[in-house]
């Protein structure tokens, strides 16, 4: 079994559930604000990769009446989404293994790229972009660094985490995407109002909104 497959398997078998238990059923405010910024309509479809227990999708569904889909590697989180939030289109799976029948108006990458190995990152990004309808949007919430490097994940030493300059990686290969917005924040969710060399780049996340123009 390859290292790439085993990392996915670790999340499906244990780490996905452990992540849900550590973080609980909270709304990801950074992602929700990005969705709100795009003002989805009732007929629009939203697909979140790494949706957790669906709290963010549920809030978007209630406030915008949009149709929502989601996947996550945590069985416990998806069961919560079905039982508590009454979401119908949520599934336990990895993104590369999941097959969607349709494309979406908004695709959200909910913080899973930093545990996506380098060898499958191009395939993953391509699939995300292909999941977005023309003239629609890709939202990415993830770690954001000026250089690429990897760490051992502190919760499981068998898992690697990857920090990258995602905007450069994405726009270099996909010039027909347009960067609408990028907002930096720290791990605690606090927005960065200034930037200097004293900031630990390992703690920086960003919300990036891309428009697919063709």
PLM regions: where:
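A conserved beta-strand element that flanks and buttresses the S-adenosyl-L-methionine
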Residues: 108
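Class I (Rossmann-like) S-adenosyl-L-methionine-dependent methyltransferase catalytic domain
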Residues: 1-45, 52-99, 116-123, 127, ...
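Short catalytic micro-motifs in class I SAM-dependent methyltransferases
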Residues: 111-115
């Amino acid at each position: 079994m390859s290292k790439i497959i085993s990392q996915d398997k670790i999340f499906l078998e244990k780490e996905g559930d452990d992540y849900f238990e550590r973080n609980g059923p909270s709304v990801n405010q950074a992602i929700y604000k990005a969705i709100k910024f795009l003002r989805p309509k009732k007929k629009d479809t939203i697909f979140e990769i790494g949706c957790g227990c669906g709290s963010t999708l549920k809030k978007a569904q209630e406030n915008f009446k949009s149709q929502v889909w989601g996947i996550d590697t945590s069985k416990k989180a998806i069961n919560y989404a079905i039982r508590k939030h009454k979401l119908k289109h949520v599934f336990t799976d990895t993104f590369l293994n999941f097959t969607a029948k349709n494309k979406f108006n908004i695709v959200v990458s909910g913080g899973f790229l930093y545990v996506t190995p380098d060898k499958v990152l191009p395939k993953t990004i391509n699939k995300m972009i292909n999941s977005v309808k023309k003239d629609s949007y890709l939202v990415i919430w993830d770690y954001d660094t000026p250089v690429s490097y990897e760490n051992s994940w502190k919760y499981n030493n068998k898992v690697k985490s990857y920090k990258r300059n995602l905007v450069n990686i994405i726009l270099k290969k996909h010039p027909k995407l347009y960067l609408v917005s990028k907002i930096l924040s720290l791990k605690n969710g606090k927005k960065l109002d200034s930037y200097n060399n004293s900031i630990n780049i390992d703690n920086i996340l960003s919300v990036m909104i891309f428009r697919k123009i063709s």
